[in-house]
Curated annotation (Swiss-Prot):
Source organism of the structure: Methylomonas sp. (strain DH-1)
Function (record text): Catalyzes the epimerization of various ketoses at the C(3) position. Exhibits the highest enzymatic activity toward L-ribulose, followed by D-ribulose, D-allulose and D-fructose. Shows lower activity with L-xylulose, L-tagatose, D-xylulose, D-tagatose, L-sorbose, D-sorbose, and weak activity with L-allulose and L-fructose.
Domain-related comment: Contains a unique short C-terminal alpha-helix compared to the known structures of the structurally similar homotetrameric L-ribulose 3-epimerases and D-allulose 3-epimerases. The length of the C-terminal alpha-helix was thought to be involved in tetramerization and increasing stability, however, the addition of residues to MetLRE at the C terminus does not lead to tetramer formation.
Binding site for D-allulose: 12, 69, 152, 158, 188, 211, 217, 246
Protein name: L-ribulose 3-epimerase
Domain of life where this protein originates: Bacteria
Length: 286
């Protein structure tokens, strides 16, 4: 079954902190709460390093919820034809699900269906079949814990499995699990889609998670993303799910993620100013 979603506004942890040490976790959670967000999206690239008890205490202290995202690596790529690598990917995804469950979260999103990064060629039938099978296993595992999985559609330089929302929906048809949803990100859509509405309208209630990011990943409204069309489409389908503000700058670096995403430029310095203005921007439109 699919698990309940609500319209809620969150911020990606990397807006405030590049690590999840005790100090980093407090900085991120306090920052998200200070800006007025409902939840924080925690990057579970290495879920074994998360201090669950500490994080739960901080979430309670700041009255914040948590969801989680991650991207796989070459060592954990579930599209691989090497069963040992697929097994490592399964293990990582299960551990991330366990951590999210312990934190009381209900949405696991991101590039959880392949390695996050540029592939040397298109996916083979076997690569795709392996990915579909892995998502079926993950969805079933997550369902036992009341968790939805949201598969993020990203640009051609970060996956060869799905680059548009329509491709994502076709992939979800193969996964065929009620708790598996589409995750759209305006930054990636701006690169790959023919307009910002088509995939949203096609997805309808299968759209389960949204990332709001500008074309350069900085301040919202200062790039070339057509947010008016995107939010109009969300209204047309009456979207009721998480909306996360996501932004990256060399000001705050996570070595496991920033280099993979090619975050070379310093697009902002003040996390609080960035996050506060982003939430205002989003709520004015949705």
């Amino acid at each position: 079954m699919a698990f309940p979603k609500r319209l809620e506004y969150g911020g990606h942890a990397l807006v405030w902190s590049g690590d999840w040490s005790a100090a980093g976790a407090r900085k991120a959670i306090a920052g998200a709460a200070r800006a007025g967000y409902d939840y924080i999206e925690i990057a579970l690239l290495d879920p074994w390093q998360i201090d669950v008890a500490l994080t739960k205490d901080l979430l309670q202290e700041y009255n914040l919820r948590a969801h989680a995202s991650l991207g796989l690596s070459a060592a954990t790529d579930v599209t691989s034809t090497d069963p040992a690598i697929v097994a490592k990917g399964d293990e990582l995804l299960r551990k991330a699900t366990d951590v999210l469950y312990a934190l009381g979260g209900s949405e696991l999103c991101g590039v959880i269906y392949c390695a996050l990064g540029k592939y040397p060629g298109p996916a083979s039938r076997e690569n795709r079949a392996n990915s579909v099978a892995a998502m079926q296993r993950l969805a079933d595992y997550a369902a036992d814990k009341g968790i939805n999985i949201d598969l993020e559609v990203v640009n051609r330089y970060e996956t060869n499995i799905m680059n548009t929302g329509l491709e994502g929906l076709a992939f979800l048809d193969e996964v065929n699990r009620p708790n598996a949803f589409l995750h759209l990100d305006t930054y990636h859509m701006n690169i790959e889609e023919n307009g910002m509405a088509k995939s949203v309208l096609a997805a309808g209630d299968r759209l389960g998670y949204v990332h709001i990011g500008e074309s350069h990943r900085g301040y919202l409204g200062t790039g070339n993303v057509d947010f008016a069309s995107f939010f109009a489409a969300l209204k047309q389908i009456d979207y009721r799910g998480p909306i996360t503000f996501e932004s990256f700058s060399s000001e705050i670096v996570d070595p496991k993620l920033s280099n993979t995403l090619c975050v070379w430029r310093n697009l902002w310095h003040d996390s609080d100013d960035l996050a506060g203005k982003a939430l205002e921007f989003i709520k004015q439109r949705y």
